[in-house]
């Protein structure tokens, strides 16, 4: 994600233009493969597909992966937010946000402002 945002800025995307990443908790390796192969622009590293494939509970692994990516995105300069998507799996979004810690970090920083 970091390299992608850096390339966008180097190419001329002004810093005042907000940039959002699209994330969601996937439920299976099959779903991850489908997104990678069928949705233009989707970046799905094979290691994430493999991790879901090998998980005892792929849906839990999907929530963990989403939480990790959300936390990582929050640390990257130039990423202003995330568009979280999971049709029919809203509880997975809520849990990924909770596990990521981003809501707690945002609340803590707003109380210091």
Q: Regions from the language model: what does each represent?
A:
Residues 1-12, 89-99:
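Active-site-adjacent beta->alpha loops and helix N-cap segments on the catalytic face
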Residues 69-81:
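A structural motif corresponding to the C-terminal end of an alpha-helix
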Residues 83-89:
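Glycine-rich phosphate-binding active-site loops on the catalytic face of alpha/beta enzymes
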């Amino acid at each position: 994600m970091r390299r992608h945002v850096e390339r966008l800025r180097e190419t001329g995307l002004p810093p005042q233009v907000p940039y959002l990443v699209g994330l969601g908790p996937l439920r299976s390796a099959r779903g991850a493969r489908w997104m990678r192969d069928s949705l233009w622009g989707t970046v799905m590293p094979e290691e994430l597909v493999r991790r879901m494939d090998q998980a005892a509970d792929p849906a839990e692994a999907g929530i963990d992966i989403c939480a990790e990516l959300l936390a990582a995105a929050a640390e990257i300069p130039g990423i202003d937010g995330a568009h979280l998507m999971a049709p029919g799996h809203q509880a997975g979004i809520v849990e990924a946000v909770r596990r990521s810690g981003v809501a707690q970090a945002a609340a803590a920083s707003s109380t210091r402002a």
